[in-house]
UniProtKB/Swiss-Prot annotation:
Gene3D superfamilies in UniProt: Mitochondrial import inner membrane translocase subunit tim13 like domains
Organism, scientific name: Xenopus laevis
Motif (Twin CX3C motif): 28-52
Keyword Zinc carried by entry: yes
GO biological process: protein transport
Protein known as: Mitochondrial import inner membrane translocase subunit Tim9
Domain notes: The twin CX3C motif contains 4 conserved Cys residues that form 2 disulfide bonds in the mitochondrial intermembrane space. However, during the transit of TIMM9 from cytoplasm into mitochondrion, the Cys residues probably coordinate zinc, thereby preventing folding and allowing its transfer across mitochondrial outer membrane.
Topology with respect to the bilayer: Peripheral membrane protein
Function: Mitochondrial intermembrane chaperone that participates in the import and insertion of multi-pass transmembrane proteins into the mitochondrial inner membrane. May also be required for the transfer of beta-barrel precursors from the TOM complex to the sorting and assembly machinery (SAM complex) of the outer membrane. Acts as a chaperone-like protein that protects the hydrophobic precursors from aggregation and guide them through the mitochondrial intermembrane space.
The entry's keywords: Chaperone, Disulfide bond, Membrane, Metal-binding, Mitochondrion, Mitochondrion inner membrane, Protein transport, Translocation, Transport, Zinc
Keyword Chaperone: yes
Disulfide bonds: C28-C52, C32-C48
Length: 89
């Protein structure tokens, strides 16, 4: 059975999510929206925003994969080292 997150951990995780969301929104807005003469979102702004979001998601996924690979390598190295230390000479 999966362990439940405490309420404080859930709040912390949600705050981190909101911080990330707000930063992403601000960065993409500043990069993509240049014309404030109309209330409508222009096609170029929409396309730019979509590309900005896609790029961020791909970057996040790639970083996560690299982070997992790094931890697997570290665990394998520790296991190999422990195996060598545990063997009689």
């Amino acid at each position: 059975m999966a362990a439940q997150m405490s309420e404080s951990d859930q709040i912390k995780q949600f705050k981190e999510f909101l911080g990330t969301y707000n930063k992403l929104t601000e960065n993409c807005f500043l990069d993509c929206v240049k014309d404030f003469t109309t209330r409508e979102v222009k096609a170029e702004e929409m396309t730019c925003s979509e590309h900005c979001l896609q790029k961020y998601l791909k970057m996040t996924q790639r970083i996560s994969m690299r982070f997992q690979e790094y931890h697997i390598q570290q665990n394998e190295a520790l296991a190999a080292k422990a195996g060598l230390l545990g063997q009689p000479r």
